[in-house]
Amino acid sequence: MITVNPDGKIMVRRCLVTLRPFRLFVLGIGFFTLCFLMTSLGGQFSARRLGDSPFTIRTEVMGGPESRGVLRKMSDLLELMVKRMDALARLENSSELHRAGGDLHFPADRMPPGAGLMERIQAIAQNVSDIAVKVDQILRHSLLLHSKVSEGRRDQCEAPSDPKFPDCSGKVEWMRARWTSDPCYAFFGVDGTECSFLIYLSEVEWFCPPLPWRNQTAAQRAPKPLPKVQAVFRSNLSHLLDLMGSGKESLIFMKKRTKRLTAQWALAAQRLAQKLGATQRDQKQILVHIGFLTEESGDVFSPRVLKGGPLGEMVQWADILTALYVLGHGLRVTVSLKELQSNLGVPPGRGSCPLTMPLPFDLIYTDYHGLQQMKRHMGLSFKKYRCRIRVIDTFGTEPAYNHEEYATLHGYRTNWGYWNLNPKQFMTMFPHTPDNSFMGFVSEELNETEKRLIKGGKASNMAVVYGKEASIWKLQGKEKFLGILNKYMEIHGTVYYESQRPPEVPAFVKNHGLLPQPEFQQLLRKAKLFIGFGFPYEGPAPLEAIANGCIFLQSRFSPPHSSLNHEFFRGKPTSREVFSQHPYAENFIGKPHVWTVDYNNSEEFEAAIKAIMRTQVDPYLPYEYTCEGMLERIHAYIQHQDFCRAPDPALPEAHAPQSPFVLAPNATHLEWARNTSLAPGAWPPAHALRAWLAVPGRACTDTCLDHGLICEPSFFPFLNSQDAFLKLQVPCDSTESEMNHLYPAFAQPGQECYLQKEPLLFSCAGSNTKYRRLCPCRDFRKGQVALCQGCL
């Protein structure tokens, strides 16, 4: 007699109720999929002999791409089934619970009906996904390495002794011991055999010579370069807004900014197009990877966008994206590590292997976070393609911190340096480090009508404080100078707060809270004064205030702030001394728009306030911070900067050609001789060079500025010879060539001349009282210090 458990009847009944016709149909699809999987793959797996490596898969395996596609589709279908059944199960459970009025429940040790079936389907989906990955790798290997070698020849694979490949045997030894340390090696077909090591090291990497029996079949032909397309200026930015993506407050801010400035970018493009005339511009394929916005870097900026956090980086990135797009180049934008890996062609694994394909981008714009991510995941390809990278670097990277060996030996410690890039690959927010390239950003440009309206609507006694975060207002001693300012002006703040007024803000300050950008601009257009507390350093807000007709008042730092005495700069790859909150505003704009005073000197501060109230200024914006100025600058960089070309060696005197200079008529400096041909390929053009001998203890950056010029590090190789010293009437009793970021230089006493041995260490920055540095300077376009007169 057969007995039936009542609980079993109930379970069967519930399953029959739960598995309605649609669900039975879905399960049928799943069963059919599994059957198709086994039948379709059976032949392919049978083609592989037991014990063979991926290199010995028979070439009769056909339909590799199709099989991969089928596997992917089946995996996706099963995942979709799981999601649909999960949703239906939740709906069924909720409806049953609703009908039962809360009486129906499951014991703690029993799963709901159908849960076991769901788990099985999920496990099947995971297995199919895993099989898809494995088969995908196997089929890739079979197609990539389809030239099968006989077993006898395979046993004869040995590391060749070739003087052109001195590291080959060592790399083979390393592969024997470590090939399982990263799955990427198996992805490229390494299976532990000697032949697989040699094939990988000769065809994927380049440490071993090509194997003779694979030359004709396995060697990949270099892809044909795509036909050149001419870049065309764009004025419609709707596609750019789509490229920028969404989902982060930072991206929303950037898109709003781009949209607001659309008309100004369009007008700037029209003006630059007229200026360039028929100049041919090749369209570049450009990847923009904003590393600091990735989850892997922490993305500390996005959550603070709506809370008064710093916006300078997002302002700059929005303008970089827009400028590149308006110039007509092909853009790809990534803000996640997964997107970066996909666009670069990173193989699966831990980043030890090169990319799976040639880099499809002519240029990559990123930041230090993105640079770290690329180095971690590109393997040897990072070294191969790093010349195409441009690093957006707010505070600059000096050559002494960039050269890893030199920085390590001489104590130039930093959290961000040691990259061994050409220093011009680092691109700054302001032109404070001529060793780097000045990228910048834009401020809104007013037309003449708007300027007149602003000038007529100014309140003569209204001041706005620079600082949206309450922490900025914790400055010690602020009550003293704010008290003086309060005697003459009504003080306004835009400090973020959630529920109650920040206690750091004095009661006499009228705090508007965090304002949207249009409202903040309206506040600036009414104000007479924009006053800084000393932080943040070198942001875009002071330029924006000056452009809206404000006078900017800032504190003078004594002693100057640097990585030696100030926590903010500690660890940054620069020794630059900052003498005020905004050195660019002080040095390149100055009075009457910018006043720099000692806030600790009450008399000086009060006198400045009185003078400012009597001073009338017009809205002012330097050309290099207009949309046209930024377009002009980036166009010149893309056209002329080529860091993939091998640099000219810094030859010692015995091998250096005679310098093509003549002493200027006033005998103070060297100039390029008129009857001398220009250096081919030099940019900036060599005729812009002016060479000065600095006084002891003076950096080349300051020496050139003293003469109304800009230091130009690309001219250093022309001066790196004893002949340059002789032309300046400096006798050299001895000449030595060494690695030192201060060379070429003349040492006193001793009459010794020192030449530079390492091209990456040519540096405008740096000084020592022992040396008189030989400094290459150049002229610059009015309002555009990044470009010389003949650079465009």
From Swiss-Prot:
MF terms in GO: alpha-1,6-mannosylglycoprotein 6-beta-N-acetylglucosaminyltransferase activity; manganese ion binding
Catalytic activities: N(4)-{beta-D-GlcNAc-(1->2)-[beta-D-GlcNAc-(1->4)]-alpha-D-Man-(1->3)-[beta-D-GlcNAc-(1->2)-alpha-D-Man-(1->6)]-beta-D-Man-(1->4)-beta-D-GlcNAc-(1->4)-beta-D-GlcNAc}-L-asparaginyl-[protein] + UDP-N-acetyl-alpha-D-glucosamine = N(4)-{beta-D-GlcNAc-(1->2)-[beta-D-GlcNAc-(1->4)]-alpha-D-Man-(1->3)-[beta-D-GlcNAc-(1->2)-[beta-D-GlcNAc-(1->6)]-alpha-D-Man-(1->6)]-beta-D-Man-(1->4)-beta-D-GlcNAc-(1->4)-beta-D-GlcNAc}-L-asparaginyl-[protein] + UDP + H(+); 3-O-[N-acetyl-beta-D-glucosaminyl-(1->2)-alpha-D-mannosyl]-L-seryl-[protein] + UDP-N-acetyl-alpha-D-glucosamine = O(3)-{N-acetyl-beta-D-glucosaminyl-(1->2)-[N-acetyl-beta-D-glucosaminyl-(1->6)]-alpha-D-mannosyl}-L-seryl-[protein] + UDP + H(+); 3-O-[N-acetyl-beta-D-glucosaminyl-(1->2)-alpha-D-mannosyl]-L-threonyl-[protein] + UDP-N-acetyl-alpha-D-glucosamine = O(3)-{N-acetyl-beta-D-glucosaminyl-(1->2)-[N-acetyl-beta-D-glucosaminyl-(1->6)]-alpha-D-mannosyl}-L-threonyl-[protein] + UDP + H(+)
Annotated EC: 2.4.1.-, 2.4.1.155
Gene: MGAT5B
Its job: Glycosyltransferase that acts on alpha-linked mannose of N-glycans and O-mannosyl glycans. Catalyzes the transfer of N-acetylglucosamine (GlcNAc) to the beta 1-6 linkage of the mannose residue of GlcNAc-beta1,2-Man-alpha on both the alpha1,3- and alpha1,6-linked mannose arms in the core structure of N-glycan. Also acts on the GlcNAc-beta1,2-Man-alpha1-Ser/Thr moiety, forming a 2,6-branched structure in brain O-mannosyl glycan. Plays an active role in modulating integrin and laminin-dependent adhesion and migration of neuronal cells via its activity in the O-mannosyl glycan pathway.
Places the protein is found: Golgi apparatus membrane
Cofactor dependence: Mn(2+)
Family (UniProt): Belongs to the glycosyltransferase 18 family.
Protein name in UniProt: Alpha-1,6-mannosylglycoprotein 6-beta-N-acetylglucosaminyltransferase B
Ranges annotated as spanning the membrane: 25-45
Species: Homo sapiens (Human)
Glycosylated residues in this chain: N127
PANTHER family found in the cross-reference section: ALPHA-1,6-MANNOSYLGLYCOPROTEIN 6-BETA-N-ACETYLGLUCOSAMINYLTRANSFERASE B (PTHR15075:SF6), ALPHA-MANNOSIDE BETA-1,6-N-ACETYLGLUCOSAMINYLTRANSFERASE (PTHR15075)
Ranges of the Lumenal topological domain: 46-792
This protein's GO CC annotations: Golgi apparatus; Golgi membrane
Top-rank lineage group of the source organism: Eukaryota
